[in-house]
Amino acid sequence: MLHWGLDQEKHPVFIQVPGGPVRHAKGPVRKSYDDLRSEVVRRGSKIAIFGLGSLFDMGEKTADILRESLGFEVTLVNPLFASGLDSELLDNLAVNHDIFVTLEDGQLEGGWGQTLASYFGNSDKHVLNYGIKKDFYDRFEADKLLHENRLEPGLIVADIRAALRRCAN
């Protein structure tokens, strides 16, 4: 992404220093971000998890737990950008997915996940959004704040299992 940011001349580029550990690519590195498409990291069915930004790793851990406990692979997506939706991907996933899960480290209300939820607003899809509730946080323990907002793989898995039961009815 850094190479792309240095080479492209069409738009301004914002480069942010990672707040957590650097995630190294496991495969070929994407060289163009002109086409704002999300990256499907794992292909599965029934459940699609979108881990935006620093919460991609949490999405990966959640997908691992689901694979072990449910016995099938779920789809894991790295959205790569928060300024819009990859509607082509969403339409393709809607064919064989019933539950869409969004994880973001920003404010839940009015965030990227709620934009995705509104995309499926008139459908039979279930969307679970996770982020930080709107509030003023002066001093806080990060782990406690994440727990209070159900931003832990085990809690997310419990919510997904409940959504699966609702889908079955």
List each model region and its residues.
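Internal gly/pro-rich beta-alpha loop/helix module
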Residues: 1-7
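Thiamine diphosphate
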Residues: 7-169
